[in-house]
């Protein structure tokens, strides 16, 4: 028992470092977290310098983990809802007539309450209102009918009245028995028919639905009935390819269920993701880099090599004076270990993250540190050929440091023949006169660094993500090889390492050459791990596209700035030695690895929805210039962002790039054709198709000013008046005669206002019983039902606002056309006790605003026409059928450990 209770000693870490004056041995922050902090700090520093003389910007570091959780939550959101009955599309208002009622299309009634009032000087509010109305259409029609209530009538299955989409129960109490029997017979005839859709049994019935809502429902039903079997097979097949590349086994447990005959399934998202959708976003390269790190980078430890390597090569003598021997026993500080992390980040993201040396004028650099860094830097980094880990400045500084080390003859003197140029490494050294010029950095050929005479970028079998087909091969190592750290690397080598050993031997640095010869297996394991991480774990839709990757190095050399500029991180000289003496060993794979494809699909789908919204909004100014006089493209950009999910906005703005996006970036993105197919995108496009008719959004430009007297009929026969179902509305059944309409543009109104004749001119037109149409501006329309005299603001309201004021002896006038317009319906109710002149006033009441909308919002119908709107075909799934959203099956998987970890 004592042995069992004995506590195990803690495993000693192999990477001790000094944190202040305390020797720490923890592994420090996760590399992914550290990367996000360092990249954001660098980006914020550059942006802050840029914005010093302009407006302030919030540069707080975003919580990437929270953003990823929010995007996963978006995948769980249901685009459609499952209901037992459709919403009520038509309701009826009871009148005093026994055989007449008012039928109201509830869609237009509800739509009139969506959004804010449109004005000419707030284009952003106009765009936001349009988006809200479009989303209202999409939400209203995105329903799936399941287990509808039915009843049995003479052996036939009949739909319950509430399923039909018509509300008429409030009418039944005032109807005669004959009319009630007629309606009951019609209801008994609403028989449920048995249908078959995609080998599944369904109920089919005829109901009522408004046209825009039914368009969305019909599109959703067509999406489901198309089965999407091929899309599902493509997604699963692609996941299998991705799993093979990333060593992930994707579960098909859920997929065995949907094949059952009692299951209806919906696939709301598709794989693979179209990478163009993600990379077309303006100024997104840094945000995509951060997402790649957050979703794919594994966690690991920094492993030191066997200490006997240095003890038997560098420090075997009692007195050691060489630079390598001096640094052998040193311990890094916390800041220096952070620089080591930066170095490994640059190695894992070649070209995207590059390194430069810290500029610290107050630091007195030990020459030994510089010399050692110059040697190991040539063995750690790649500078040219196909990509680079370094800036041109750092490569030159490393060349100078290597030059100094070779000329530092602390053991024996070696012959040196200098060249004519005076460039670093322009000499021949040793008995065999080794030409050191070959180690001078050449970004064209990669000479002097790891890319020298090595195929470090390869294209072989097709990769799952079509935009990133490259395979990185540091030191010529194939990432498909399995790594056994105890034996891997023995007998392996590559050109730059061989030449370094030859040059060290020629320079008389035999101990150092022996050290590097012994370090070679450790060095090869290091880069074999990095190759595996890059080619397996980091392969993602957020990986830099091949064309951008291939352009990074030429652009860096030429000083050209493109869409994907590299992130430059600063490191210290001594950190190169500590990085060479430590290898990043992955211990756990990223928790988001198997969920990453679903996160990518959700993100791309939301971006596609935003792009479709912006395309349609960008056309608004050309279609309705009068309401968007002061509009700019940035207005609809902001409106779309404000109505987009917070998680998607946060990803797009990870590097605070929204503060720097210009109109050129935005319009270029909007016009690019790439989209990610999804159910949400399909419904959004259909909603915009329905919204192309602005009257379906309860917006109209057919608003007229006309003086009309409110009817005041005599009640000579109360019973007959009741039977007529008398009502009045300012809604026109047809536009007025064209020759009686005066078109008032802004220019005409301003001219008459400047002359002080605006009101007089309108009065003259009204006295002639003519009509005035104020421009072609869109107006927000509200619907109101009243059974008494409407308020004065409704009756006397004008389709414009005209304000005058005097300032400094000058008269100013303000004219606005975009005002809220109210369509009112006045229903006359009378009693038998009313006298013939009960509705008559001494002075007449006038209405001044008339509206024409080519939609049947309200109409007076006879009782036998109550169910005449049942003309839409609905498909309902039976109650015993299951409706499954199998989108979540695209993320069910298990990460496989690497065979040698």
From Swiss-Prot:
Give the matching SUPFAM superfamilies.
Answer: Reovirus inner layer core protein p3
Tagged with keyword Iron-sulfur: no
Q: Name any GO cellular component annotation.
A: virion component
The answer on whether this UniProt entry bears the keyword Repressor reads no
- Major place of residence: virion
Which keywords accompany this UniProt record? Virion
Q: Give one GO term, molecular function aspect.
A: structural molecule activity
Question: Mind telling me which InterPro entries this protein's record contains?
Answer: Inner_layer_core_VP3_Orbivir, Inner_layer_core_VP3_Reovir
Q: Name one Pfam family in it.
A: Orbi_VP3
Query: Could you tell me where this protein is found in the cell?
Result: Virion
The protein's role, per its UniProt record: The VP3 protein is one of the five proteins (with VP1, VP4, VP6 and VP7) which form the inner capsid of the virus.
Q: Its family?
A: Belongs to the orbivirus VP3 family.
Which protein, by its recorded name, is this? Core protein VP3
> From which organism does this entry originate?
Bluetongue virus 1 (isolate Australia) (BTV 1)
């Amino acid at each position: 028992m004592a042995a069992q209770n004995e506590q195990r000693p803690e495993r000693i870490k192999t990477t001790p470092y000094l944190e202040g004056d305390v020797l720490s041995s923890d592994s420090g922050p996760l590399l992914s977290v550290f990367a996000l902090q360092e990249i954001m700090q660098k980006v914020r520093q550059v942006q802050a310098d840029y914005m010093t003389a302009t407006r302030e910007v919030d540069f707080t570091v975003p919580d990437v983990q929270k953003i990823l959780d929010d995007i996963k939550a978006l995948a769980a959101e249901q685009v459609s809802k499952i209901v037992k009955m459709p919403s009520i599309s038509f309701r009826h208002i009871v009148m005093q007539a026994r055989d007449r009622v008012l039928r109201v299309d509830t869609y237009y009634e509800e739509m009139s309450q969506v959004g804010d009032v449109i004005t000419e000087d707030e284009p952003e509010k106009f765009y936001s209102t349009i988006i809200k109305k479009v989303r209202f259409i999409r939400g209203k029609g995105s329903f799936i009918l399941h287990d509808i209530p039915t009843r049995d009538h003479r052996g036939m299955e009949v739909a319950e009245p509430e399923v039909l989409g018509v509300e008429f129960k409030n009418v039944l109490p005032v109807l005669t028995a004959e009319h009630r029997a007629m309606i009951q017979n019609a209801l008994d005839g609403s028989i449920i028919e048995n249908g078959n859709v995609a080998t599944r049994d369904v109920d089919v019935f005829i109901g009522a639905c408004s046209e825009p809502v039914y368009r969305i429902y019909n599109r959703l039903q067509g999406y489901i009935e198309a089965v999407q079997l091929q899309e599902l097979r493509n997604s699963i097949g692609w996941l299998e390819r991705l799993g093979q590349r990333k060593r992930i086994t994707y579960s098909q447990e859920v997929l065995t269920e949907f094949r059952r005959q009692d299951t209806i399934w919906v696939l709301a998202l598709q794989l693979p993701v179209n990478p163009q959708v993600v990379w077309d976003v303006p100024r997104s390269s840094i945000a995509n880099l951060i997402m790649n790190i957050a979703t794919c980078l594994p966690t690991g430890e920094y492993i030191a090599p066997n200490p006997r390597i240095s003890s038997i090569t560098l420090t075997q003598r009692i007195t050691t004076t060489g630079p390598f021997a001096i640094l052998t026993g040193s311990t890094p500080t916390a800041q220096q270990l952070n620089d080591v992390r930066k170095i490994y980040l640059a190695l894992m993201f070649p070209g995207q993250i590059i390194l430069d040396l810290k500029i610290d004028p107050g630091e007195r650099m030990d020459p030994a540190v510089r010399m050692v860094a110059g040697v190991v830097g040539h063995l750690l980094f790649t500078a040219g050929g196909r990509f680079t880990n370094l800036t041109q400045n750092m490569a030159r500084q490393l060349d100078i440091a290597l030059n100094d080390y070779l000329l530092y003859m602390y053991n024996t003197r070696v012959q040196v023949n200098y060249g004519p140029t005076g460039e670093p490494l322009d000499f021949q050294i040793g008995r065999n006169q080794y030409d050191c010029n070959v180690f001078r950095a050449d970004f064209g050929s990669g000479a002097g660094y790891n890319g020298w005479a090595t195929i470090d970028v390869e294209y072989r079998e097709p990769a799952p993500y079509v935009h990133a087909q490259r395979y990185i091969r540091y030191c010529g190592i194939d990432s498909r090889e399995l790594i056994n750290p105890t034996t891997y690397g023995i007998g392996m080598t590559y050109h730059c390492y061989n030449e370094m050993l030859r040059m060290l031997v020629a320079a008389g640095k035999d101990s150092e050459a022996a050290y590097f010869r012994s370090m070679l297996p450790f060095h090869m394991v290091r880069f074999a791990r990095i190759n595996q991480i890059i080619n397996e774990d980091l392969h993602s839709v957020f990986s830099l596209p091949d064309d951008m990757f291939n352009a990074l190095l030429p652009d860096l050399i030429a000083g050209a700035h493109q869409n994907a500029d590299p992130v430059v991180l600063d490191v210290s000289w001594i950190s190169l030695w500590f990085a060479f003496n430590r290898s990043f060993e992955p211990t756990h794979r990223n928790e988001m690895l198997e969920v990453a494809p679903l996160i990518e699909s959700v993100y791309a789908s939301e971006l596609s929805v935003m792009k479709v919204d912006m395309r349609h909004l960008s056309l608004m100014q050309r279609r309705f210039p009068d309401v968007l006089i002061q509009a700019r493209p940035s207005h609809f950009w902001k409106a779309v962002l404000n109505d987009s999910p917070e998680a998607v906005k946060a990803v797009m703005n990870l590097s605070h790039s929204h503060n720097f996006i210009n109109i050129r970036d935005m319009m270029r993105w909007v016009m690019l054709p790439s989209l990610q197919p999804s159910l949400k995108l399909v419904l959004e496009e259909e909603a915009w198709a329905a919204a192309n008719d602005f009257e379906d959004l309860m917006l109209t430009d057919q608003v007229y000013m006309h003086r009309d007297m409110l009817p005041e009929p005599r009640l000579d026969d109360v019973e007959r008046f009741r039977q007529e179902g008398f009502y009045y509305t300012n809604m026109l059944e047809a536009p007025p005669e064209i020759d009686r309409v005066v078109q008032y543009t802004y220019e005409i109104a301003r001219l008459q206002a400047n002359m002080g004749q605006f009101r007089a001119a309108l009065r003259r037109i009204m006295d002639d019983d003519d009509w005035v149409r104020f421009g072609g501006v869109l107006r927000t329309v509200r619907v109101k039902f009243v059974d008494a005299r409407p308020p004065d603001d409704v009756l006397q309201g004008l389709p414009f606002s005209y304000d005058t004021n005097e300032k400094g002896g000058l008269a100013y006038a303000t004219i606005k056309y975009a005002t809220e317009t109210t369509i009112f319906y006045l229903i006359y109710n009378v009693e038998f006790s009313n006298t013939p002149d009960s509705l008559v006033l001494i002075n007449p009441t006038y209405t001044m605003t008339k509206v024409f909308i080519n939609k049947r919002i309200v109409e007076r119908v006879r009782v036998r026409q109550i169910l005449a709107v049942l003309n839409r075909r609905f498909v309902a799934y039976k109650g015993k059928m299951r409706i499954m959203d199998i989108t979540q099956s695209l993320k069910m998987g298990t990460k496989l450990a690497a065979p040698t970890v």
